[in-house]
Curated annotation (Swiss-Prot):
Name of protein: Cytochrome c oxidase subunit 1
UniProt: heme a3 binding residues: H384
Highest taxon of source: Eukaryota
Binding site for Fe(II)-heme a: H70, H386
Species of origin: Phytophthora megasperma
Length: 492
């Protein structure tokens, strides 16, 4: 190949095996994906701002395509690349005293699988009538009868690519943390962020192959006349749900665990002392990872599970609240009595703890199978998981950004602007997602672009909140610009 005409700098980025460069690429990529995903969420809230058809002109399929793309982009192209690929690549080698990751070239391909995956996902949304299946891609809605055309197939290939990317990354992190620690750095002395990435990597390694199998069988059902999920050929759509949620539930812990790690690091740094109950924190994360793999059917209380099965999954789900509670109170105990300077990272830590508790409490409510049957597939669930994602994982990303941007870029962020961003985002997401619990209890179903007039009040409030948080996202990019262009250089 003739590379003479291509800028050398561009090639350095393309072929880089340096963990910091790759971490930076991940962070930039996730920021772009975040813009797309946030814009899609704004479209959803504009449609739901008032009853009747607003911007999708009664096209329910298009609405569901937007919902599906929003979910996939936020989960697989914003949160995972930022927390695991971005901060994980940047700081795990530094925290364990390793010169780089164990497999630097594999690290490079892990990142470069993501842009084509995003391209495939966007393609799936814009060809024919799009993939309007929801991020769960349940058959028979995702079958070839209900979703003809290439859209769902493209979405499946996109998932395969992100899955391979995450799998390679997980192998890389496990090898790095096992084999490349500095002499004397035992497992019981690892920083909590490193622990969180290690546990996340094991969860990915355990669950992603199951997802790959599930969606590959869906692919053959659609194109090669198999009937894994088709009752007319002796298959069962509930099998898909079991396989999907065996991945899907650990996935939400994959999203939140690295955020737990960041929150632990930042809380300890601002309290100027060690994390309270270090070993308890480690074993709490291990327990969350283990329990997260044996509670998947709590997503399926409405498919007609046996009563004993429902009892088990309810009980097991509630037990996850115990290690989570240990972490919450250990963070509070870490901050307790510290001489706290209320700078932006600490504000995000406090916001994280407060809102994660709200998200956790609604989660415990939903673990009751009897209650869940009433609120399943309503906005109560949307409210719950956006509290733990939009205010758990994303607050974790912002915490890491404000805490580490000096180390990443060598420049200081403007403190006053950071605090304005925190308050804008904090107020915006709460106004957006708190009313959803009321709407869910009133029976407003998910994935439907219209609703009864009686629910217009809280929907208007929710949409107003989303405009605030959308503005705060734009403001955040202004802060990034100011930091990189005009930011004061850090001391060392």
């Amino acid at each position: 190949m003739n590379f003479k005409n291509i800028n050398k700098c561009q090639l350095d980025w393309l072929f880089s095996t340096n963990h910091k460069d790759i971490g930076t690429l991940y962070l930039i990529f996730s920021a772009f994906a975040g813009i797309v995903g946030t814009t899609l969420s704004l479209l959803i809230r504009m449609e739901l701002a008032q009853p009747g058809n607003q911007i999708f002109m009664g096209n329910h399929q298009l609405y569901n395509v937007v919902v599906t793309a929003h979910a996939f982009i936020m989960v697989f192209f914003l949160v995972m690349p930022a927390l695991i690929g971005g901060f994980g690549n940047w700081f795990v080698p530094l925290m364990i005293g390793a010169p780089d990751m164990a497999f630097p070239r594999m690290n490079n391909i892990s990142f470069w699988l993501l842009p084509p995956a995003l391209l495939l996902l966007v393609s799936s949304a814009i060809v024919e009538s799009g993939a309007g299946t929801g991020w769960t891609v349940y058959p028979p809605l995702s079958s070839v009868q209900a979703h003809s055309g290439p859209s769902v197939d493209l979405a499946i290939f996109s998932l395969h690519l992100t899955g391979i990317s995450s799998l390679l990354g997980a192998i890389n992190f496990i090898s790095t943390i096992y084999n490349m620690r500095a002499p004397g750095l035992s497992f019981h002395r690892l920083p909590l962020f490193v622990w969180s990435v290690l546990i996340t990597a094991f969860l990915l390694l355990l669950t992603l192959p199951v997802l790959a199998g599930a969606i590959t069988m869906l692919l053959t059902d659609r194109n090669l006349n198999t009937s894994f999920y088709d009752p007319s050929g002796g298959g069962d759509p509930v099998l898909y749900q079991h396989l999907f949620w065996f991945f899907g539930h650990p996935e939400v812990y994959i999203l939140i665990l690295p955020a737990f790690g960041i929150i632990s690091q930042v809380a300890a740094a601002f309290a100027k002392k060690n994390v309270f109950g270090y070993l308890g924190m480690v074993y709490a994360m291990l327990s969350i990872g283990l329990l997260g793999c044996i509670v998947w059917a709590h997503h399926m209380f409405t498919v007609g599970l046996d009563v004993d099965t429902r009892a088990y999954f309810s009980a097991a789900t509630m037990i996850i609240a115990v290690p989570t509670g240990i972490k919450i109170f250990s963070w509070l105990a870490t901050l307790w009595g510290g001489s706290l300077k209320f700078e932006t990272p600490l504000l995000f830590v406090l916001g994280f703890i407060l809102l994660f508790v709200v998200g956790g409490v609604t989660g415990v409510a939903m673990s009751n199978s009897g209650l869940d049957i009433a609120i399943h597939d309503t906005y109560y669930i949307v409210g719950h998981f956006h509290y733990v994602l939009s205010m758990g994982a994303v607050f974790g990303i912002f915490t890491g950004f404000y805490f580490w941007i000096g180390k990443i870029s060598g420049r200081k962020y403007p403190e006053i602007l950071g605090q304005i961003h925190f308050w804008l985002f904090f107020i915006g997401v709460n106004i957006t997602f708190f009313p959803m619990h009321f709407l869910g209890l009133a029976g407003m179903p998910r994935r439907i672009p219209d609703f009864p007039d009686a629910m217009s009040g809280w929907n208007a409030v929710s949409s107003f909140g989303s405009y605030i948080s959308f503005f705060s996202a734009l403001f955040f990019f202004y802060i990034v610009y100011v930091t990189l262009v005009y930011g004061k250089k850090t001391e060392n």
